[in-house]
């Protein structure tokens, strides 16, 4: 498949190909996602938001270990799959999956204790606008964890510049601090790990 097609499906999975892409993303990024969830330091009474949940690899853990999980994804295909897979939790009022973007999160201010996003910042028009929305929906003292491959790695993949905007750790840190997150730090399981998880407190 050409890089532009892969990039388009990564940013907005659609139809049968989108479902396959979701499965591939889950398989390829399993360790990265598990590490991001670990950095959330989940508690049983937490209300958690995941932006761009894609194939939904984190959702079983979030649903099982917290009081409420919300997910926002721009892909109607991924939202429909999550609603079907977690129909019991949705009916019980413990989960809510919506189509949307980080620039306009469909939730009230202070609605969540924790929030995460993995491999989505390449597609955001503005880091500051996205993080400002995450800051808005997090309660004071809440935590955000942002997982991504840094620009130095992404540049080697040759993804189309009109669909991907690679980000440096410094850019992500600066944007989080600009909208009011504190204690912002980069963490990785080992110094040789390619991807980063940036953690900030509201």
Indicate where each model-derived feature is located:
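Class I SAM-dependent methyltransferase SAM/SAH-binding core
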Residues: 47-104
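Short glycine-dipeptide loop
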Residues: 45, 138-143
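A short SAM/SAH-binding and catalytic strip from SAM-dependent methyltransferases
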Residues: 114-127
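Conserved alpha-helix/loop element of class I SAM-dependent methyltransferases that forms part
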Residues: 27-46
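A short glycine-rich, Lys/Arg-flanked "PGG" loop and its adjoining helix->strand segment in the class I
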Residues: 128-140
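Conserved class I S-adenosyl-L-methionine
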Residues: 143-171
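A short acidic, Gly/Pro-enriched loop at the edge of an enzyme's catalytic core
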Residues: 103-114
């Amino acid at each position: 498949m050409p890089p532009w097609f892969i990039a388009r499906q990564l940013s907005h999975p659609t139809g049968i190909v989108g479902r396959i892409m979701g499965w591939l993303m889950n398989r390829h990024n399993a360790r990265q996602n598990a590490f991001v969830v670990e950095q959330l330091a989940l508690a049983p009474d937490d209300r958690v938001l995941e932006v761009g949940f894609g194939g939904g690899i984190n959702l079983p853990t979030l649903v099982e270990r917290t009081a409420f999980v919300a997910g926002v994804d721009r892909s109607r295909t991924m939202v429909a799959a999550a609603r079907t897979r977690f129909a019991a939790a949705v009916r019980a009022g413990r989960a809510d999956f919506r189509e949307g973007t980080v620039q306009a999160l469909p939730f009230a201010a202070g609605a969540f204790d924790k929030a995460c996003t993995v491999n989505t910042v390449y597609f955001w028009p503005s880091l500051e606008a996205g993080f400002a929305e995450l800051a808005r929906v997090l309660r004071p003292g809440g935590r955000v964890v942002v997982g991504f491959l840094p620009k130095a790695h992404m540049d080697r993949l040759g993804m189309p510049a009109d669909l991907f905007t690679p980000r440096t750790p410094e850019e992500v840190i600066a944007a989080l601090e600009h909208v009011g997150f504190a204690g912002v730090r980069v963490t990785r399981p080992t110094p040789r790990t390619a991807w980063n998880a940036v953690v900030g407190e509201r």
